[in-house]
């Protein structure tokens, strides 16, 4: 399951998941590629239960998107121990799966 983060404090709490891989999908409701990739991210969340999956609307929580230096959507940022380990920009399922598999 992919949980939506609705505030900076929810985002900070999500990143404090210890050594667990945290995947945050930065999206926008008006973004076509974001809508296209969303079902794949849900599928990855089911496949990789050792990771925590979140999504964040860049228009609702713009301060977090700015802080994370997100300028294109979708951008998926992968965190471990609260620190970014990699990111995938664009609706690229193969790159997203590779990033998850190599960091779980």
Curated annotation (Swiss-Prot):
This protein's record includes keyword Protein transport: yes
Protein name (record): Thioredoxin-2
GO MF, one example: disulfide oxidoreductase activity
Native source species: Saccharomyces cerevisiae (strain ATCC 204508 / S288c) (Baker's yeast)
Xref: PROSITE patterns: THIOREDOXIN_1, THIOREDOXIN_2
Family as reported in the entry's similarity comment: Belongs to the thioredoxin family.
Entry annotation: catalytic residues: 31, 34
Superkingdom of origin organism: Eukaryota
Gene name, Swiss-Prot/TrEMBL: TRX2
Keyword flag Protein biosynthesis: no
Positions of post-translational Phosphoserine modification: 62
Site (Deprotonates C-terminal active site Cys): 25
GO biological process: cell redox homeostasis; deoxyribonucleotide biosynthetic process; endoplasmic reticulum to Golgi vesicle-mediated transport; glutathione metabolic process; protein transport; retrograde vesicle-mediated transport, Golgi to endoplasmic reticulum; sulfate assimilation; vacuole fusion, non-autophagic
